[in-house]
């Protein structure tokens, strides 16, 4: 029941009856506004003024933290060496942090190394290239005169004004006549090839020099006459053999006259044996003997003196 009474009392202030809401006379704009927005604006101003100071403090804090806990450490060695290495690597890490803030909004580090800066936009280069391309564009070529009008001296003009026009029938007749002439010339060439019989046995005085010439073999009579002629030539050389034999006989006679008695006895014995023994065949050489090669005996010298 209490809920219904509250609803009944709030009925005049509902959305449907908001135009009929009665406002008190003492109400003003200053009373309706609250002090909360003024406090929020003051806080924002204080934050902006203190942001620059906080940046410097954060940098100092980062450096101190990095110096205390560097990402890279060297263990071992003397204390002075450890202090130097710690200072060096702490400065490197702080420099990487400071440069990473200038890269952009996405301040992301891949380990201890910073991401490289993005490349500069190539808008300026594209604009320059675009201007050059527009200038280098070829203009559409205009209509040019044909060459036979621009340079008539290079061309020859043919006209058929003096020739009478002929009908189709006459043109066909001329074409048929030309075809017949070609056929007749081909037939005549074929007939000439068929009637040609190559003759191989021709005289040397023939006009066709490139043709093959065959000669008949000679008869047996001619071959016999050649043999007789060869025999005659052999007979004509017999006088040379006679001379050679005469020279050999003289040489034998000279060698038979020896002054020693023992040689004579031997010759006497040999003569008797020759008489008893039948004469044997004597072979003589056909070489010509030079008499100057034989030594002269004292009998020959006496004979020459006499």
Swiss-Prot record:
Residues 218-243, 296-306 have a biased composition (Basic and acidic residues). Residues 59-81, 198-210 have a biased composition (Polar residues). One of its GO terms (biological process) is spliceosomal tri-snRNP complex assembly. InterPro entries: TSSC4. Keywords: Cytoplasm, mRNA processing, mRNA splicing, Nucleus, Spliceosome. It comes from the Eukaryota. Signal peptide: none annotated. One of its GO terms (cellular component) is spliceosomal complex. Residues 1-81, 109-128, 182-306 are annotated as: Disordered. It is found in: Nucleus; Cytoplasm. One of its GO terms (molecular function) is molecular sequestering activity. Belongs to the TSSC4 family. Interacts in a RNA-independent manner with distinct U5 snRNP-containing complexes, the mono-U5 snRNP and the post-splicing U5 snRNP-PRPF19 complex. Protein associated with the U5 snRNP, during its maturation and its post-splicing recycling and which is required for spliceosomal tri-snRNP complex assembly in the nucleus. Has a molecular sequestering activity and transiently hinders SNRNP200 binding sites for constitutive splicing factors that intervene later during the assembly of the spliceosome and splicing. Together with its molecular sequestering activity, may also function as a molecular adapter and placeholder, coordinating the assembly of the U5 snRNP and its association with the U4/U6 di-snRNP. This is U5 small nuclear ribonucleoprotein TSSC4. It comes from Danio rerio (Zebrafish). The gene is tssc4.
């Amino acid at each position: 029941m209490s809920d219904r009474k509250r609803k009944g009392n709030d009925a005049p202030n509902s959305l449907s009856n908001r135009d009929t809401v009665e406002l008190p006379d003492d109400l003003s704009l200053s009373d309706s506004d609250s002090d909360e927005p003024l406090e929020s604006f003051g806080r924002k101003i204080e934050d902006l003024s203190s942001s620059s100071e906080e940046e410097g403090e954060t940098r100092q804090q980062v450096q101190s933290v990095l110096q205390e806990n560097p990402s890279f450490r060297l263990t071992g060695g003397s204390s002075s060496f450890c202090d130097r290495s710690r200072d060096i690597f702490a400065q490197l890490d702080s420099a990487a942090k400071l440069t990473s803030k200038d890269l952009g909004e996405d301040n992301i580090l891949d380990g201890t190394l910073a991401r490289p800066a993005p490349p500069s936009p190539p808008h300026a280069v594209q604009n320059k290239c675009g201007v050059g391309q527009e200038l280098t564009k070829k203009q559409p070529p205009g209509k040019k005169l044909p060459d036979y009008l621009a340079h008539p001296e290079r061309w020859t003009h043919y006209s058929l004004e003096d020739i009478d026009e002929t009908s189709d029938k006459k043109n066909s007749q001329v074409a048929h006549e030309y075809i017949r002439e070609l056929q007749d010339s081909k037939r005549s060439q074929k007939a000439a090839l068929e009637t040609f019989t190559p003759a191989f046995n021709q005289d040397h005085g023939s006009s066709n020099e490139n043709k093959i010439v065959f000669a008949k073999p000679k008869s047996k009579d001619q071959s016999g006459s050649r043999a007789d002629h060869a025999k005659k030539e052999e007979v004509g050389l017999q006088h040379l053999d006679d001379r050679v034999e005469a020279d050999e006989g003289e040489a034998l006679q000279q060698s038979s006259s020896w002054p020693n008695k023992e040689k004579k006895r031997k010759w006497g014995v040999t003569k008797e044996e020759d008489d008893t023994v039948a004469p044997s065949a004597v072979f003589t050489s056909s070489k010509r003997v030079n008499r100057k090669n034989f030594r002269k005996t004292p009998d020959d010298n006496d004979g020459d003196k006499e």
